[in-house]
Amino acid sequence: MSITGMDSSHVTESQGALLFNEPLAEYTTWRVGGPAARLYKPANIDDLALFLSRLPFDEPLLWLGLGSNSLIRDGGFSGTVILTQGCLKEMTLLSDNCIRVEAGVSCASMARFSARNNLSGGEFWAGIPGTMGGALRMNAGCHGGETWQSVIEVQTINRRGEIRTRKPEEFEVAYRHVAGLGDEWFISAKLQLSPGNKETSLQLIKDLLAHRAKTQPTNEYNCGSVFRNPPGDFAARLIESCGLKGVSIGGAVVSEKHANFIINHQGTATAANIEALIHLVQTKVREQTSIELIREVHIIGDANVQTR
């Protein structure tokens, strides 16, 4: 069946939900972005595998968790979005201080789950506004911790719905970057932490979240850090040194609280506003410091709003 002819019959034997022309703004932490031609919410990993096995091989795919670290353009996405948030959400305590976690589990939930099971080393996940699938994809980290320092093995799936178990040595893992995934996506991971104390870990999480609220614009729509830190420096320091705090384009504003955050002020920004401000910040920093800021955020989709 061609994708243009795909309808609800495509998932007759599936347990998930297939939505058409679905607005994506509500699925992203920036609260911007046009509609997806199709959005699928899988019931579980087996259901996801079945759905993927029936998609046309050339169908554009976008995987979306909490929608942080992503800028969906105003024209939306003309393919199929696979939503993991609220869908692939299983966490299982294993032996040897290990946890198996699915890709749609929020990083904050993972931090609390590990702490409540007297495991330490995962508290930093509480400060990451995304899912574990996204954390695996970019080796997300903060406060001295990185996701891949705990990985024992991962499960991946390809667009044919085929599932593989892979080891860390099969990937090239670096700061905010993981290479070697190919045309596959992370669907779960086995992580090994250290024995700990529940009360100590929960207090550390509480302190981390308090620090985050004090130093980041957590009460405004944002995607998390916009740029990677360059070697030996901080993106926020460079942006602030160029006098860019508070600079705005439309409703998009460089945060006064943390210069490596761009906020959607009171929900008035468009994706085009945010993208233009990202380019402006990169240009000004390059002109004044000769340093090229590299985006952490992924820009996705069609720039032009389509008439449907």
From Swiss-Prot:
Which reactions appear under catalytic activity for this entry?
A: UDP-N-acetyl-alpha-D-muramate + NADP(+) = UDP-N-acetyl-3-O-(1-carboxyvinyl)-alpha-D-glucosamine + NADPH + H(+)
- Give an example GO molecular function: UDP-N-acetylmuramate dehydrogenase activity
Query: Which keywords fit this entry according to its UniProt record?
Result: Cell cycle, Cell division, Cell shape, Cell wall biogenesis/degradation, Cytoplasm, FAD, Flavoprotein, NADP, Oxidoreductase, Peptidoglycan synthesis
Q: Which cofactor does it need?
A: FAD
Pfam families in UniProt? FAD_binding_4, MurB_C
Compartments reported by the entry: Cytoplasm
Q: In which pathway does it act?
A: Cell wall biogenesis; peptidoglycan biosynthesis
Superkingdom in the source lineage? Bacteria
Example GO CC term: the record gives: cytosol
> Which intervals hold domain FAD-binding PCMH-type?
32-196
Q: Which GO terms of type biological process are on file?
A: cell division; cell wall organization; peptidoglycan biosynthetic process; regulation of cell shape
> Residues of the signal sequence?
none
Q: What is its EC number?
A: 1.3.1.98
Function, as annotated: Cell wall formation.
Q: Which family does it belong to?
A: Belongs to the MurB family.
Protein name, as recorded: UDP-N-acetylenolpyruvoylglucosamine reductase
Query: Whose protein is this, by species?
Result: Legionella pneumophila (strain Corby)
Q: What gene does this protein come from? A: murB
